[in-house]
């Protein structure tokens, strides 16, 4: 395994650990989730470049689309919670139900 792949896997692992440690705050969880998605994007891009298969070249773009949708929904929830309660705790998500 090359050092590049090890660094990307280390970045994913650190983001996953951050997600587990700061799971009560929505903003920190969203930042860790973005770090995980970016490391996955870099990994899939490197794999697509190394395999040179035309079928796998679209995979990083699909991953970026899902990451953008995840970020938009997460930020909408963050704004809704912070406007309603003034805090970014994840346990406030249950209070947004009708």
Curated annotation (Swiss-Prot):
Family of this protein: Belongs to the complex I subunit 4L family.
PANTHER family for this protein: NADH-UBIQUINONE OXIDOREDUCTASE CHAIN 4L (PTHR11434:SF0), NADH-UBIQUINONE OXIDOREDUCTASE SUBUNIT ND4L (PTHR11434)
Catalytic activity field: a ubiquinone + NADH + 5 H(+)(in) = a ubiquinol + NAD(+) + 4 H(+)(out)
Disulfide bridge map: none
Bilayer topology: Multi-pass membrane protein
The protein's role, per its UniProt record: Core subunit of the mitochondrial membrane respiratory chain NADH dehydrogenase (Complex I) which catalyzes electron transfer from NADH through the respiratory chain, using ubiquinone as an electron acceptor. Part of the enzyme membrane arm which is embedded in the lipid bilayer and involved in proton translocation.
Keyword Disulfide bond on entry: no
Keywords of the record: Electron transport, Membrane, Mitochondrion, Mitochondrion inner membrane, NAD, Respiratory chain, Translocase, Transmembrane, Transmembrane helix, Transport, Ubiquinone
Any single GO CC term annotated in Swiss-Prot or TrEMBL for this entry: mitochondrial inner membrane
Its EC number(s): 7.1.1.2
Gene Ontology MF, one: NADH dehydrogenase (ubiquinone) activity
One Pfam family recorded for the sequence: Oxidored_q2
Residue ranges crossing the lipid bilayer per the database entry: 1-21, 29-49, 61-81
EC main group: translocase
Protein name according to UniProt: NADH-ubiquinone oxidoreductase chain 4L
Quaternary structure note: Core subunit of respiratory chain NADH dehydrogenase (Complex I) which is composed of 45 different subunits.
InterPro entries: NADH_UbQ_OxRdtase_chain4L/K, NUOK/Mnh_C1-like
């Amino acid at each position: 395994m090359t050092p590049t792949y090890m660094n990307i896997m280390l970045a994913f692992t650190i983001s996953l650990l951050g997600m587990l440690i700061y799971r009560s705050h929505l903003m920190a969880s969203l930042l860790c989730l973005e770090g995980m998605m970016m490391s996955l994007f870099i990994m899939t891009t490197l794999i697509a470049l190394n395999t040179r298969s035309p079928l796998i070249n679209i995979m990083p773009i699909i991953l970026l689309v899902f990451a953008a949708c995840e970020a938009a929904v997460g930020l909408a929830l963050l704004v809704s919670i912070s406007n309603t309660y003034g805090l970014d705790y994840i346990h406030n998500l249950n209070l947004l139900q009708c």
